[in-house]
Amino acid sequence: MTKQRILFITTGGTIASVHTPQGLRPVLSSDELLAHLPELNDLCIPETLALCSIDSTDLGQEHWLMMARAIQENYALYDGFIICHGTDTLAYSAAALSYLIQNADKPIILTGAQQPLSNEITDAKKNLRDSVICALDPGSRGVMVVFGGHVIAGTRAKKNKTISYDAFASVNFPELALVQGDRLVRYVPSPWPTGPVEFGRAMNPRVFLLKLIPGMDPGMIPEIFRLYDCVIVESFGVGGIPQRLMDAFAEGLGHYEQTHKVLILTTQVTYEGSDVGVYEVGKRVKNRFRFLEAHDMTIEAVVTKSMWLLAQNCDSFDQLQQRFYRQVNFDTFYH
């Protein structure tokens, strides 16, 4: 049987780092990464593309667009893509690529490591090998995260451990599969494309994430609305916002009503999502504002979906709302 061609796209991160007097620094080239795993040649035809070599905390919208463009330019040449990425912002990149690359009929996998590949004891080799096993499975399609043996939809991944090897969890949705040795045990089928693969070319970075704290001074809220096109509010519980903060939100939205500013409400709680209408404090919000509610979506998905949608120049709030709730790569089950 003909071996499949897999393109490894490297971006830096812990997996490509070595110890220096200044701390871990990503310096390994893409070819040096694969040199640590010669056994991959028995599974596939691995080739490499070095996109950048930076700490993932320095990654942003321009890098997500670079990743999408690199996959677009090589899409016809390879059977699958594995992006080696730092763990700190990997979930953001996975969500962003889920929106920037839709209807993919090939696997696009993000992985990384908690310990550098150059270490004697590391999770990097397992994660890279597991990613190849997942990529070679004929049922693998679209953007996903492979880490610690777990396969997670790109819009549902969240880093919830800073040191442990099982660093990522699937939030409010089952894991897609598990990698057990050379076998992929699938729980959820990958979504079938509804048309030809589509690549996005723009994201609007003017999105602000505001985490509420008890007793927060509302004075900065109108200024936030002045500077940003979309404000995502991490409310308390299922969707509570203090009364004095609501007054500030009303001022901010009212002042910029004609400029299509967007307010999105979500929750600080990782699991089970928001439901603004449950309590009186939430119902006050519903009666006073025009907003989108994130419901079961992860913060990473809400942030990147907002950036993607705002770059599409929706004609009205209703159109934006319709697109926001359209499911992409299992990101939401609210209709």
Language-model-detected regions and their locations in the chain:
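ATP/NTP phosphate-donor binding region
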Residues: M1-E73, Y271
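Accessory alpha-helical/coil subdomains and C-terminal extensions
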Residues: T2-R5, I9-S17, S29-L40, A153-V238, ...
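Short acidic, glycine/serine/threonine-rich loops at helix termini
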Residues: H19-Q22, A94-A95, E120-D123, A153-K159, ...
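Short acidic, glycine-rich surface-loop motifs adjacent to enzyme active sites
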Residues: Y78-L90, L227-G239
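Short Gly/Thr/Asp-enriched flexible loops that form oxyanion-binding sites at enzyme active sites
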Residues: C84-K106, Q243-E251
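Short, acidic/small-residue loops that bind anionic groups at enzyme active sites
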Residues: A94-D123, V132-P138, H255-T267
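Internal gly/pro-rich beta-alpha loop/helix module
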Residues: L110-Q180
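C-terminal non-catalytic interaction/assembly regions of soluble proteins
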Residues: V238-H335
